[in-house]
Amino acid sequence: MKLAIIAGDGIGPEVTAEAVKVLDAVVPGVQKTSYDLGARRFHATGEVLPDSVVAELRNHDAILLGAIGDPSVPSGVLERGLLLRLRFELDHHINLRPARLYPGVASPLSGNPGIDFVVVREGTEGPYTGNGGAIRVGTPNEVATEVSVNTAFGVRRVVADAFERARRRRKHLTLVHKTNVLTLAGGLWLRTVDEVGECYPDVEVAYQHVDAATIHMITDPGRFDVIVTDNLFGDIITDLAAAVCGGIGLAASGNIDATRANPSMFEPVHGSAPDIAGQGIADPTAAIMSVALLLSHLGEHDAAARVDRAVEAHLATRGSERLATSDVGERIAAAL
């Protein structure tokens, strides 16, 4: 296995170090190459993501990312120039966000309900393609547009992936959209789910408007198994899903090229938290959970399950104890 590591900014290097510690414990001998990308490189060289680095990243099996973002860099420079560029250059058309409430983790929902679903979010289309513009900026007559792009090809490959995941799980898929208002894009998503669903007669299909889905994610999250949705709606509901499962500090994600032509990238959802960087108190659990996703994607299912069980044991027994970053990594690695 050849792994590229982008530790990034803030707490990124700290949590990534613990994730790598767990990876080495469960799968020894991984070839690792670290890339200095983020605020430090930007300030030193003016570069965000050189073409040469993109070419090198393509030669790896996967990418492990820590966190990107620093208040010393103008807003959007790293987010668009690094994170979004990687997504489009490496065709990460699926953003995978598991949502599971682990034993021992407090949910803001009463009764700690059973929550275990996954959101399959389209990652390269929708309103995030940069298709739009503005005229008469700064005047009372300013007009700004953001065009949401949805292609039959792009929608179908994400829907097909979601059905495959539903078949391997509890055989239930929910399409989340807003078809009563976004009739053109929504119609494409609905037709595609119907067409692809014919190949999966064992998977039950449901539809919910995005506003209804947010309500049910709070009042009845157990109804969801696999959710498939577009880029914008997915961006919103995945953070809500993280909130009901204990917060983004316990949320992992995968940015996936399902064709495997390019390396997929795995990362914790949380930000770079520069206010606590260097103090050794950042929780690396989400970064370690990202390792489990990475291993599963690469077919190392037994190793992925071992990491997940070790994380579950850690969360179930940690109580209110505040552990140092390195202690969390050691504890989870020891439980493998």
From Swiss-Prot:
The keyword Transferase does not apply. Substrate binds at R87, R97, R121, D211. InterPro entries: ICDH/IPMDH, IsoCit/isopropylmalate_DH_CS, IsoPropMal-DH-like_dom, LeuB_actb. NAD(+) binds at G271, S272, A273, P274, D275, I276, A277, G278, Q279, G280, I281, A282, D283. The keyword ATP-binding does not apply. It comes from the Bacteria. The record marks Y128, K178 as: Important for catalysis. Keywords: Amino-acid biosynthesis, Branched-chain amino acid biosynthesis, Cytoplasm, Leucine biosynthesis, Magnesium, Manganese, Metal-binding, NAD, Oxidoreductase. GO terms for molecular function: 3-isopropylmalate dehydrogenase activity; magnesium ion binding; NAD binding. One of its GO terms (biological process) is L-leucine biosynthetic process. PROSITE patterns: IDH_IMDH. Pfam families: Iso_dh (PF00180). SUPFAM superfamilies: Isocitrate/Isopropylmalate dehydrogenase-like. Mg(2+) binds at D211, D235, D239. Pathway: Amino-acid biosynthesis; L-leucine biosynthesis; L-leucine from 3-methyl-2-oxobutanoate: step 3/4. Gene3D superfamilies: Isopropylmalate Dehydrogenase (3.40.718.10). Its EC number is 1.1.1.85. It is found in: Cytoplasm. One of its GO terms (cellular component) is cytoplasm. Homodimer. Catalyzes the oxidation of 3-carboxy-2-hydroxy-4-methylpentanoate (3-isopropylmalate) to 3-carboxy-4-methyl-2-oxopentanoate. The product decarboxylates to 4-methyl-2 oxopentanoate. Belongs to the isocitrate and isopropylmalate dehydrogenases family. LeuB type 2 subfamily. This is 3-isopropylmalate dehydrogenase. It comes from Mycobacterium bovis (strain ATCC BAA-935 / AF2122/97). The gene is leuB.
